[in-house]
């Protein structure tokens, strides 16, 4: 009974990790496209600002939005790495996190 419970738990954890991995893969792709678009928008706004066709507020808004999209992309990549680690652990990998006060 204990063995069956452990097997069910391992299967459930593996399934959850795979679902998370698949979901983050799609979201990372979308975030990359969005980040590229915001980067282009920032470059266009910078050009318009240098030519006197955009205000400083518009330029700073473009910068803020581009940085927010880059931050979101980094967070999604972190989430994806975390999902890979969860999958590795669920599949029986020997992952041991270091305690905060331990030295590597």
Provide a role label for each language-model segment.
Residues 89-104:
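Terminal intrinsically disordered/low-complexity segments used for targeting and assembly
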């Amino acid at each position: 009974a204990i063995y069956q419970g452990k097997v069910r738990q391992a299967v459930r954890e593996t399934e959850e990790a795979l679902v998370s991995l698949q979901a983050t893969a799609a979201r990372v792709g979308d975030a990359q496209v969005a980040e590229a678009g915001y980067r282009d928008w920032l470059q266009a706004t910078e050009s318009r600002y240098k030519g006197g066709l955009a205000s400083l507020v518009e330029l700073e808004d473009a910068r803020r939005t581009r940085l927010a999209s880059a931050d979101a992309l980094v967070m999604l990549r972190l989430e994806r790495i975390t999902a890979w680690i969860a999958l590795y652990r669920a599949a029986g990998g020997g992952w041991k996190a270091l305690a905060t006060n331990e030295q590597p």
